[in-house]
Amino acid sequence: MTEGSKVSEIMKNLSMQVNLDDFIPATEEEKEYMVQMRPSTTAFKDGIRRLRKNKVAMVSFYIILIITLSAIFVPMFWPYKYEMMLGMQPGKPVDATFNNLRPFEYSASELALKEQGQKVFPHIFGTDSAGRDYFIRVVYGTRISLAVGFFASIIVLVIGLLVGSVSGYAGGKVDMFIMRIVDIIYSLPDMLMVILLASVLKMTLASKLDGTPLAKIGSNIISLFIIFALLYWVSMARLVRGQILSLREQEYVLAAQAAGAKGGWVIRKHLLPNCVSVIVISTALQIPSAIFTESYLSFLGLGVNAPMPSLGSLASDALNGLSSYPYRLVIPAIVISLIVLSLNLFGDGLRDAFDPKLNS
């Protein structure tokens, strides 16, 4: 082989061009596999994917969904109303046999109707001492407890976002002043302050709400919302402040400030959107706390106004006949425990799925 042919052979081997004859043709199965492209994903989609893999969180979510839908829709078609005293019908004598019926037990008049061949809707959980269907009272009490927990958490969210974002972004004396207020509220005994405020507000609001649209809601529920607005925003404010402090030195925030953007615009457009996952998780964990607070206040007689039921007031009323009708206490206690446990487990699942610190 001549020297020139050797050089050309070496140059051919060093060439960047690919010789297709050196490769085995791909099979049809390999070609189909190669054209399959992975769909694009986002942080939200990635978090949802991780959440769906968490079986405990998903079971908790479906339990919450079933309880919520039942609390909303069951009273719409149930033949009994939560305040209806079945033994006191207009134009008829009082029928005391409706009082204290056990589960699936019928009164004397209902048994007479059944003997005549008429259909009578059963009392699944029996009736209470006033002859009211206990099942619909538990369902309606669940609706009230869930509604109070949800709206109280929204109040905490709004106040905590406002105070925490201002404190974290402003810094300096403003931050120090707000944090000292937070420290003072944290130092107060929670239970004592809640009971004290509930007692004072109950007496104060009862007379002022008469004749107003808020009277239908009840002074006790309004006082609950005021208590949450006064005492329970501090954790959310601290959380948001910490997130704002860690984000306000980022380059995109400094660029917006250099461009002349105002503080409110920077907070709305840049800072809070980057705190959404943490805020959602904290709000989800706040709901069971609000439900538990409402339940024990109702248990103490400081919750919803009668005859409107809540799970706590049902448990409190059940104490009078505990030895004879223990299921009246067990049923609302189980519902409260199931709601609070499911919400806490679902909140933990959200945190595991969306908290970037846990995923790093």
Describe the residue ranges of each PLM region:
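Gly/Trp-centered helix-boundary motif
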Residues: 1-157, 161, 165, 307, ...
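Alpha-helical transmembrane segments of integral membrane proteins
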Residues: 130-360
